[in-house]
């Protein structure tokens, strides 16, 4: 796929303002792609120039290095949505540059189930299959029909069925074995009218307190947004606790024996969510607090949210190095106490071989 589009990348563009964490240096080159042809042209341009590229979506899941990125940052701005019907199901295709929560709101307004628990998650549609975003008992992979991608290896546009995407907990082939190979251009979802997902602990408790006996997708979205706001997990310029990447660490999945071992150490049993393989997912926030990192913890220009221990926040003027220092301390503290080693959720951009990033991303401390 060879594009004839003429590119005009900008030089030395600041990146800190393009991420919700607000850290990071400039991009050597920056370009916004509003059509799939722009993606193809940018890939060829980088190959000709011999420089790396990084594909940017909504910037809500990134830690950008203080030195920035010495290559091309390609921001995906492909927009547009379309809807068709297949019996009772609605088939929705959305451009990768569409804002995720706006799409969720539209689908909820139509009474369609499958997205309601994913309300309030920042970023763009294109980032959702990469991370296999999930919350409160739902994962986006359960609603995905196929993903249209630009293949940087053979320079073609491909459609990958959900079964070809390698979806797992907070994982996909796009950030696993094939990381860097594909650029998500649009995503097609299958949704249908029906009862919402409303059994996950926090959501179920909120609905019970609100005396909701027959949940709807709209009521569940309202509940999820309220819960996320209470934790500083909805991006809000007026809320300093939202100057973060959201949950910095994934909830670890452990054996039942390890859960009981943690209970003995902590003197109380951690809550858990049973997985299909017999293991249990326990809250990283629970482990972090019991390792001594409480809500409101301050470490210079960074800290832990006053609302939720999973969010590491930029308190103002922080550098990426400050964020890594705190993240490393949290991972080390949890690992030392419980021998459970947390895995970070965000993507680290521009760091090269960095000892802090290496420590954070390896399976054990």
Language-model region placement:
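Anion-binding (especially nucleotide phosphate/pyrophosphate-binding) glycine-rich loop
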Residues: 1-153
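Phosphate/pyrophosphate- and phosphate-bearing ligand-binding catalytic cores of soluble enzymes
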Residues: 9-11, 17-20, 62, 157-321, ...
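Beta-rich strand-turn-strand
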Residues: 112, 320-326
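Conserved kinase catalytic-core segment
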Residues: 155, 327
């Amino acid at each position: 796929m060879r594009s004839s589009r003429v590119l005009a990348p900008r030089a030395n563009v600041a990146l800190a303002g393009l991420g919700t964490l607000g850290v990071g240096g400039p991009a050597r080159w920056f370009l916004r792609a509003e059509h799939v042809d722009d993606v193809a042209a940018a890939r060829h341009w980088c190959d000709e120039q011999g420089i790396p590229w990084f594909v940017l979506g909504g910037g809500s899941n990134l830690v950008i290095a203080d030195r920035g990125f010495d290559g091309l940052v390609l921001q995906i701005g492909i927009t547009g949505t379309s809807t068709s019907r297949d019996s009772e199901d609605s088939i929705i295709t959305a451009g990768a540059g569409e804002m995720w929560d706006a799409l969720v709101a539209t689908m909820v307004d139509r009474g369609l189930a499958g997205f309601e628990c994913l309300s309030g998650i920042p970023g763009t549609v294109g980032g959702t299959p990469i991370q296999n975003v999930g919350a409160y008992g739902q994962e986006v992979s359960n609603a995905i029909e196929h993903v249209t991608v630009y293949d940087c290896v053979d320079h073609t546009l491909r459609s990958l069925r959900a079964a070809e995407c390698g979806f797992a907990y907070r994982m996909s082939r796009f950030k696993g074995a094939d990381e860097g190979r594909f650029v998500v251009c649009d995503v097609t979802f299958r949704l249908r009218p029906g009862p919402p997902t409303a059994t996950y602990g926090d959501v179920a408790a909120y609905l019970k307190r609100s005396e909701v006996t027959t949940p709807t997708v709209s009521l569940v979205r309202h509940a999820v947004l309220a819960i996320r706001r209470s934790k500083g997990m909805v991006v809000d310029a007026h809320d300093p606790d939202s100057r973060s990447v959201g949950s910095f660490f994934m909830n670890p999945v452990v054996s039942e024996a390890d859960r009981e071992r943690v209970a003995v150490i902590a003197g109380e049993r951690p809550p858990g969510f049973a997985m299909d393989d017999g293991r249990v997912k326990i809250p990283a926030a629970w482990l972090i607090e019991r390792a001594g990192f409480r809500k409101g913890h301050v470490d210079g220009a960074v800290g832990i949210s006053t609302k939720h221990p999973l969010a590491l926040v930029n308190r103002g003027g922080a550098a990426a190095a400050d964020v890594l220092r705190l993240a490393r301390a949290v991972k080390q503290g949890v690992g030392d106490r419980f021998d459970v080693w947390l895995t970070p959720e965000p993507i680290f951009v521009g760091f090269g071989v960095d000892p802090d990033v290496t420590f954070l991303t390896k399976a054990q401390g």
